[in-house]
Amino acid sequence: MPDKQKGPGRTIGSSILLIKTFIGQQSTVELWDTILARFDAEDREEFSRLTPAGWGSYRLFDSLLRHGAAAVHADPAVFADAFGAFQVEHDTAFLYKMALKFGGPGLMVLETDQLWRRYHNTGHLKVYEMLRNSAKARVADLSGGSPLLCVVVGGFIRKGLELAGASNVAMSHERCVHRGDANCEYAANWD
């Protein structure tokens, strides 16, 4: 479990570095130099010392999502949602995928906070309503991030539920700290 800290939250370095892999799969053209050129000095410095097991700022995470989306000519929200789905597929080991498949969407829902803490050192993701084909979850105590982080989380949850056997997953982000709400809240419905 990540150490909690005061101040703006951070995300695990492997998550930020995975965005580079995702960008590479979006285009046959090498885009990395173009993206690095768009970084400001602070982003370049932080990225140069980032390690998979270290923590990176949400600022860098957001910057890489925005510059990556621009490089592949994608809407940032569409790009962020697709990255969230890519991340859960990439980071979920085969055996865990099988456990999710046999455990069904309910297991995915029960594991949400453990999954959250794997990637973030701030906030908690808790399910507060669970029905047979729907669930609602809340991210509380989030420090930092951006609206694109919220989109990544939605894509991650949606794809995680699909990997767990849910079909026709519909996600909504009903409340958002970046729109002035106290917490972020997500609702998922599936067949």
Task: Label each PLM-derived region with a short phrase.
Residues 1-74:
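N-terminal leader/assembly segments
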Residues 2-20, 117-154, 161-191:
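Short terminal or interdomain "cap/linker" segment that borders an active site or interface and mediates
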Residues 30-42, 78-82, 110, 168-177:
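Short alpha-helical "patches" and their helix-cap loops
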Residues 41-48, 88-91, 176-187:
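Short, mixed-charge aromatic SLiMs
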Residues 50-152, 175:
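Amphipathic interaction/junction segments at domain boundaries or subunit interfaces
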Residues 58-60, 159, 184:
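Short, electropositive, low-hydrophobicity segments enriched in small/polar residues
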